[in-house]
């Protein structure tokens, strides 16, 4: 997938159509003046959307804009409070996801929920297994041969080289995402909702997905596509609708948009740069990784990071970047090699050792590994530094509150107070809370694994601004990212890995998309 934004001519005079797209023919879906309220929150306020058959309609907006709520209404998970939905010319009144599926509406959720101990085939046909009967027996039996055969046909269609009998737990997250797409295709849906479908898959798999989307379009299937990735939007969209604060902002064919205009409509303000990287003084070597190896995972990895420097760790999925970071943070053990901090060799047997030496890591999966979602903002911020607030066996709530308020102000976290439950915040604010948790400590090295995955463009800009500020304060930063624009926009140097080895190191001037991809694919 190209990381270069496709720039198209902006609309002449005006900011895009102020009503849903009304040109052309063949609307498969019309959502009119949809409202939805939750206790204390108006999630959707008169939102409208029109989608043409045989097109990809990209729905964009910052986290919290209401995109997921709108799609959950369409897919039968939520009931509407007001408005109406027309699907293939008929008014929809379904009150369940099963009814939506029966109508031909299928949704691929960003957060997967496969049955891990079942096979690929069993997951795809769960609840609608093909059956056969036997003479004299009232019960029907699952036809596993047919189910496996049909699954193999679907896998071949998408180019996936897996057996239908492979257990889901043996697949990568990326492959599980593709299996969800296979499941939607198997239902012969006439409208498929894809919520961040490429958030955890490689460029090769993205290209595979886009080819399948092209086939679906040709068959007349409508696709509502939610993504924060600008390059994807302009690569795949036929039409674009922009949401903000639960309301319709604008809609137009993708050919009438350019990135700057789209971003401005999404956030309601002008963002000067998504990558506000500034030159800051580079200091002495903080981290030195020497001949680091882990059997079967990565081999002979070496690089350095200096104070005030952001080093981008780039490579394809499976290159070993996260695995190296896990060793530096003490989550996994190396079989050979040395990790030095300020020249001193470290013995890293657990994250506790890393934290004690001033090393922090923000995981790529903030919800599973970075936050306690059911706890408050204040509790999450103080989580890694409870000793600072402890007096004997008691925690000083006053000190904890003061420190949390300081972090909220410094990182500009949008929350009404420290008592707010973290699960109810946007992805961008959740990521800031993970950062705040570590910044309370005495940090020397910060490892950021996919720091802006799944967050909107406005929040991305904020995270990037904070990274620059941390570097200015002398922090050494490792940034792992699968988004080339982010690597190119934020890195002082780029270390590229392929199949568990470092294949090259590039200065900011040398770092281009072509050079990185050449090294990431094993070239020299």
Curated annotation (Swiss-Prot):
It catalyses: D-ribose(out) + ATP + H2O = D-ribose(in) + ADP + phosphate + H(+); D-galactose(out) + ATP + H2O = D-galactose(in) + ADP + phosphate + H(+). Signal peptide: none annotated. Residues 29-270, 280-524 form the ABC transporter domain. Keywords: ATP-binding, Cell inner membrane, Cell membrane, Membrane, Nucleotide-binding, Repeat, Sugar transport, Translocase, Transport. Pfam families: ABC_tran. ATP binds at residues 61-68. GO terms for cellular component: plasma membrane. InterPro entries: AAA+_ATPase, ABC_carbohydrate_import_ATPase, ABC_transporter-like_ATP-bd, ABC_transporter-like_CS, P-loop_NTPase. Its EC number is 7.5.2.11, 7.5.2.7. Its main location: membrane. It is a peripheral membrane protein. One of its GO terms (molecular function) is ABC-type D-ribose transporter activity. It is found in: Cell inner membrane. It comes from the Bacteria. Belongs to the ABC transporter superfamily. Carbohydrate importer 2 (CUT2) (TC 3.A.1.2) family. Part of an ABC transporter complex involved in carbohydrate import. Could be involved in ribose, galactose and/or methyl galactoside import. Responsible for energy coupling to the transport system. This is Putative ribose/galactose/methyl galactoside import ATP-binding protein 1. The lineage of its organism: Bacteria, Pseudomonadati, Pseudomonadota, Alphaproteobacteria, Hyphomicrobiales.
